[in-house]
């Protein structure tokens, strides 16, 4: 299906080697012919074959304002499934904007955010989970996050979900025949086979759901709070992880009075770190407000790095902090490993996932902390090439499908009859079709594509 011809800049704004203006739609070759003049007069834009390129000049009102390359794609062998022309001009906002304006004057319409990928979805070039993976791939900061998104773009999730749908569809066909046509002498489903199929599907869905949190960390990053007493080494830790002097470090207790924020790439994980004010009793109103914010960040964080001064015995504030970390995704870092140790780590160990001796001034500690964070958040064991869920929409659909399959197993075990099992299997299939986008409403499609930028 060929839609209205649209145009937009497909590359990031600002100075660069090249900028790409993408045209897609029924008249994109005609529009391109009005703004692009091949250097070889014998070459005609309208006659260009797919997967070919022409060098030439970009014109606006017959005035050549840049030179570059036009790439041609014929429907359906293009990203959108429509005729597509990509015009590569020199980078820089002025040239790219003028080229887009020339395309609009020549008959194109401005593309809406995500409209190219939306057309790819509507034309069957991508499934909904693959379309969502495009945005994940664009936003990925680490290799593993990019690999997860690329696996989904390649259809890993869609294939896994379709395999479960095939199992349930075959099961439902037998159930429906037995329930709806009792006079046809349809053999009753073997209870053991029923339990085996439903159990296998539930196990696959459980695996996807379990891996969601680790996958989300790789794709989206996590907020991390650095907490501890004054002069324990919190700001030194932030500087170590950031790779430069982000926070002021002095021997004066209470130097950090407000929350200092810094994005850090730790291995394959993006951390949004918050270095907080030192936790202690104080009568200073400004410092007290900083401490209040420290506790608030601790409660909100998806990762807690609690720093303790290993050169001193545990204080009352240390023990209070440890207790506040109980049951949270928290790592205790006993700092100043380069000094004689006076800190009894066993007193705080029950409250943390792990306790690590470190020296926040040494680069080697960064690797130790990175490995510990990966273990705690589950990213160290995730297969970046495997199917994984992305976003609340997919997770919600997977949970509904898993719960419906569990309901079918309960109905079978409780002797409620195969008609009750059939209803649950139907619900599971509906949820899986929601996940893949086969049942997606216009509102859901809008929600997916509203995250996209113009030009993608």
Regions found by a protein language model. Give the residues of each.
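C-terminal-of-GTPase-core extension/linker across diverse P-loop GTPases
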Residues: 2-13, 143-265, 282-284, 313-456
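Inter-motif core of Ras-like GTPase G domains
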Residues: 287-311
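Short glycine-/small-residue-rich Rossmann-like dinucleotide-binding loops
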Residues: 242, 277-278, 302, 309, ...
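Switch I (G2) and immediately adjacent beta-strands of P-loop GTPase domains
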Residues: 55-65, 70-74, 254-282, 300
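Short, Asp-centered acidic motifs that coordinate Mg2+ and/or phosphate
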Residues: 271, 303, 331
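Generic enzyme active-site microenvironment
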Residues: 273, 307, 333
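A glycine-rich (often HGG/GG-containing) alpha/beta subdomain
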Residues: 1-147, 151, 155, 331
């Amino acid at each position: 299906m060929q839609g209205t011809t649209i145009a937009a800049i497909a590359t990031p704004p600002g100075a660069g080697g090249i900028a790409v203006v993408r045209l897609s739609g029924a008249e994109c070759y005609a529009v391109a012919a009005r703004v692009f003049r091949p250097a070889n007069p014998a070459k005609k834009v309208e006659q260009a074959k797919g997967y070919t390129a022409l060098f030439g000049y970009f014109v606006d009102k017959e005035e050549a304002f840049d030179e570059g390359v036009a790439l041609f794609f014929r429907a359906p062998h293009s990203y959108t499934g429509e005729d597509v022309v990509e015009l590569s001009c020199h980078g820089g906002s002025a040239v790219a904007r003028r080229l887009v304006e020339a395309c609009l004057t020549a008959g194109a319409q401005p593309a809406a955010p995500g409209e190219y990928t939306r057309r790819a979805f509507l034309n069957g070039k991508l499934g909904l989970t693959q379309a969502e993976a495009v945005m994940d791939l664009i936003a990925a900061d680490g290799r593993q996050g990019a690999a997860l998104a690329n696996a989904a773009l390649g259809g890993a999730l869609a294939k896994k979900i379709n395999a479960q749908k095939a199992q349930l569809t075959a099961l439902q066909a037998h159930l429906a025949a037995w329930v709806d046509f009792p006079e046809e002498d349809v053999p009753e489903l073997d209870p053991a086979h029923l339990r085996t199929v439903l159990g296998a599907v539930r196990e696959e869905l459980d695996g996807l759901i379990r891996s969601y949190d680790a996958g989300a960390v790789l794709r989206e990053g996590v907020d991390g709070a650095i907490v501890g007493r004054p002069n324990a080494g919190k700001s030194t830790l932030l500087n170590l992880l950031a790779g430069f002097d982000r926070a002021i470090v002095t021997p004066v207790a209470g130097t950090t009075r407000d929350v200092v924020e810094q994005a850090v790439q730790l291995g394959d994980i993006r951390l949004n770190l918050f270095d907080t004010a030192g936790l202690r009793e104080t009568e200073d109103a400004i410092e007290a407000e900083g401490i209040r914010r420290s506790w608030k960040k601790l409660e909100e964080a998806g990762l807690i790095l609690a720093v303790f001064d290993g050169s001193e015995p545990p204080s009352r504030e240390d023990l209070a902090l440890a207790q506040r970390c109980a049951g949270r995704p928290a790592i205790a870092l006993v700092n100043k490993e380069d000094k004689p140790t006076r800190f009894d780590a066993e007193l705080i160990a029950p409250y943390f996932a792990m306790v690590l001796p470190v020296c926040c001034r040494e680069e080697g500690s960064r690797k130790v902390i990175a490995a510990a964070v990966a273990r705690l958040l589950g990213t160290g064991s995730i297969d970046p090439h495997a199917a994984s869920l992305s976003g609340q929409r997919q997770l919600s659909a997977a949970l509904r499908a898993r719960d419906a399959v569990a309901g079918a197993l309960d109905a079978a075990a409780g002797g409620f009859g195969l008609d009750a099992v059939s209803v649950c299997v139907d619900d599971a299939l509906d949820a899986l079709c929601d996940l893949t986008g086969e049942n997606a409403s216009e509102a859901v499609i809008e929600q997916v594509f509203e995250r996209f930028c113009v030009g993608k």
